[in-house]
Amino acid sequence: EGWKFMEKNYPQHMIFHEPLNRKVVGVKCYNIVETRKPEEKLRRLVEEEPKDELIASTQSVLKIVNEHACLSLENFGVFGSLLHGFYHPKYSDIDLIVYGRQNVAQICETLQELYKNSGSPLKNEFESDEPIRGKVWRFKNISPKEYVWHQQRKTIYAVFHDESSKRAIKVEFEPVKEWKEIQNEYGDIKKITWRGWVKALACIREDVDGSFMPSVYRVEVLELLEGPKVDDIERVISYLEEFRMQAWKDEKVYVEGNLEKVETQRGSFHQITLTYGPRYYEQVIKVLEHV
């Protein structure tokens, strides 16, 4: 629906993507009026005297995690309503960015330890099924119980119990790559072709980019349950927030999604892609035998 809205109302923001041979949503450089840097905004919020309770809570959260994780302010940024300045002090959440693979690993380890401490004001948002309780469940191939289990162990979704405001504030620690970790594949990929729908059992062989968007999992397919018979599926790539940090190295997973052939300058391979489009709620990557 979002794609159709942009195509109808803002066609100038539809850019041709050569490997896909179709237009996608994007912004051309000459249409950019302003760029807002998450790390600069956060630095200003932290260095200034807090003007409201949400800023004070943000400063408190950063102080707690930095003291335990031995990270610096430079490793963080802020996004969402705090970045753009339209937050509500009494109702908005705290959306933080953590830059870099090593720092993400460090913050996850730190949060895990804080969650175990009964005296910590930071708790795991998914220590129970409360975040999804009573909501309509649309995903077809992952149950609410399975979803909560996966979310809980990611640790990046927290709740801060603020004594001053008496609020339980949701806090997200969004993993983002450092500039030096980013590799642009656009020039290397010649063509991406949709081959059909696939269901497979696989083993995660590499998960170093599973924390980011898109999430990339290098896999070895153990069994192709349904779909085109190919023998060179190398990775699962997910553009869906629900499936970031979903599986770790050496874990066995069930995957269902779009099979794509990727042709590069050096050869070709197949990938399973979880993305926005038809059969959205049938897509999944989940760990097997986790309970």
Question: What are these regions, as identified by a protein language model?
Answer:
Residues 1-91, 99-291:
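Catalytic core of pol beta-like nucleotidyltransferases
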